[in-house]
């Protein structure tokens, strides 16, 4: 991969492009036609989507060696996104431990055995077109749900982070209102389309989740995910700036592995298990094309995709494990890509 463990380009390139690009977007560079503005919105949405990828790395605490730096960086990003760092981390820990099962908070409702096909189809639309609201709801469930698995310490941290989000956004709204009332800022000149890149970035994140998991029946971390590993430069550059998250099977099996080790982890697994067909795709487009039928035919994972509810991690997990899973059996191999229409 580009630079392996070198992090700084990820934190410099897309934030810089996004900030400079926003200036161009707001000032009308390229014209003010609807098509030009939509192109700007999609481009900037992708930039912010890449920037938000660092939130995922902070949750895993794999950006450098400082735990505190990861935590506070994650809290800053989470405050901006409206998703408390601790909510995301606790939900994501269980996503790795209980992937594609009923205990997987991140893949609700697609993993819930009792969720109707109609509800899951409707939620797909919400996950894409209302992603800016869907993401905080899905991640926040672990805090608000009855019989929440969160410890009291985690609940206290979540409460404080929700308060910080409310204060941050409340201050911005109040400040803009005061500036407007005093004639310093004319909100009538504000174009709501300038906000469009944000929900588009959230939609990119929702579709990324689908590409990684939707339609996958197996609960084995390697076989129950789609992995993208290509040789063309477009795929590899996109992978680099998304912290190699598309090498998703190894990421799920080795949650504590730094992103730049995932390709070698996959090669090691393939060498040990030459007879197992792993869902590896050469391009993002190939993975997306495999996902698209699942969006409507049967948007589900695990039981809802024809698999089982079997887990490979003990109950009550409270942190990422070093390695999740087992030696893939012929049964798991057989259901890895099976879907139910």
Model-derived features with residue positions:
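Non-catalytic, topology-defining segments of multipass membrane proteins
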Residues: 1-47, 79-191, 195, 259-341
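Transmembrane alpha-helical segments that form the membrane-embedded catalytic/substrate-channel core
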Residues: 45-58, 84, 88, 133-139, ...
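Histidine-centered catalytic micro-motifs
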Residues: 52-60, 88-100, 208-216, 241-257
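Aspartate-rich (DDxxD/NDxxD/DxxxD) Mg2+/diphosphate-binding motifs
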Residues: 53-72, 100-110
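Short acidic-hydrophobic sequence patches enriched in Asp/Glu that either
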Residues: 64-72, 84-87, 199, 261
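Membrane-cytosol interface motif
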Residues: 71-80, 219-232
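Cytosolic juxtamembrane regulatory segments of multi-pass membrane proteins
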Residues: 226-244
